[in-house]
UniProtKB/Swiss-Prot annotation:
This is Ribosomal RNA small subunit methyltransferase H. Specifically methylates the N4 position of cytidine in position 1402 (C1402) of 16S rRNA. GO terms for biological process: rRNA base methylation. Its EC number is 2.1.1.199. Its main location: cytoplasm. Keywords: Cytoplasm, Methyltransferase, rRNA processing, S-adenosyl-L-methionine, Transferase.
């Protein structure tokens, strides 16, 4: 059965694929978006696919290595500037966050519901694993990451518990960490609250984002995408939590809206918009949520590159 990504139809409509265009799928995953783009491309079209995850790249090579329209590169979309010349792309797609295969395979170490090694790296060959990071850093740094990237209100208590636990035995397994966090939450007044999410959800999110430099890569990748898009080209981004969506929303706004001016100062027209927001933020409808509950938090935003005069070519 072919994998259908979250907000697939809306993403394809947002990209507005042209037959001979050149496109980037910066987060290949299982290839659902890439297949959608290729179905609309003619023989003269081109598709660059990227992913941090070597397993995703291996899947891309199995599926598309014989297609002359496809170029496959292993790496973060933050490296886009090294691969695409300025104004060379007609569309860029980023489908952010962790992919279903990463969550569903315990050995990848992303899931608090399935026991596996505490890894969380999208590229297992790059940087520290979550276990290595938690074993090395201070209580304060752990708390800061849980608060900043996980928006976890109990970040200090959880960090304190992690440091106390690791003094006696190493934290090496996902369920080991999840149970420790759950025990901390049960000892607080928040433990009695009924929540739809697991008590370790926010902490796992925060650690994962930090280990993979997700928000740093997003900021760099958005700027690179803007530079690489031709006038009239489309930027389509699907985010899955408020931190990602805030960065995307602010990026589009910063490049599309005239900043406020001081009425007491002489008016000098220096701002030239580079993007035009296309419609409002899009969320999954009830029909999609019935098929894919993971789509509940997804938000899709679309923007269009303008020319230097502020008009679409």
């Amino acid at each position: 059965m072919t994998h259908v990504p979250v907000l697939y139809t809306q993403a394809m409509e947002g990209l507005r694929v042209v037959e001979n265009g050149t496109y980037l799928d910066g987060t290949f995953g299982r290839g659902g978006h890439a297949r959608g783009v290729l179905q609309q491309l003619g023989p003269g079209g081109r598709l660059l696919v990227m992913d941090k995850d070597p397993e995703a790249i291996a899947m891309a090579e199995r599926a598309f290595s014989c297609d002359p329209r496809v170029v496959i590169r292993h790496g973060s979309f933050a490296l886009l500037a090294q691969l695409a010349a300025p104004q060379s792309l007609d569309g860029v797609l980023f489908d952010l966050g962790v992919s279903s295969p990463q969550l569903d395979v315990p050995e990848r170490g992303f899931s608090f519901a399935k026991d596996g090694p505490l890894d969380m790296r999208m590229d297992p060959e790059m940087g520290e694993s979550a276990a290595q990071w938690l074993a090395r850093v201070s209580e304060r740094e752990i708390a800061d990451v849980l608060w900043t990237y996980g928006e976890e209100k109990q970040s200090r208590r959880i960090a304190r518990a992690i440091v106390a636990y690791r003094a006696n035995q190493p934290l090496l397994r996902t369920v080991q960490l999840a149970e420790l966090i759950a025990s901390v939450m049960l000892r607080t007044k928040f433990g009695a609250c009924k929540s739809r999410i697991h008590p370790a959800t926010r902490s796992f999110q925060g650690i994962r984002i930090h280990v993979n430099r997700e928000l740093v890569d997003l900021e760099v990748g958005l700027e690179a995408a803007l530079a690489a898009l031709r006038p009239g080209g489309r930027l389509v981004v699907i985010s899955f939590h408020s931190l990602e969506d805030r960065i995307v929303k602010q990026f589009i706004s910063r490049h599309s809206k005239v900043p406020p001016t001081n009425r007491r100062l002489p008016e000098v027209q220096t701002f030239v918009p580079l993007l035009r927001m296309i419609g409002r933020a899009i969320k999954a409808d009830e029909d999609e949520l019935e098929v894919n509950p993971r789509a509940r938090s997804a938000v899709l935003r679309v923007a269009e590159k303008l020319d230097v005069l502020g008009a679409v070519r």
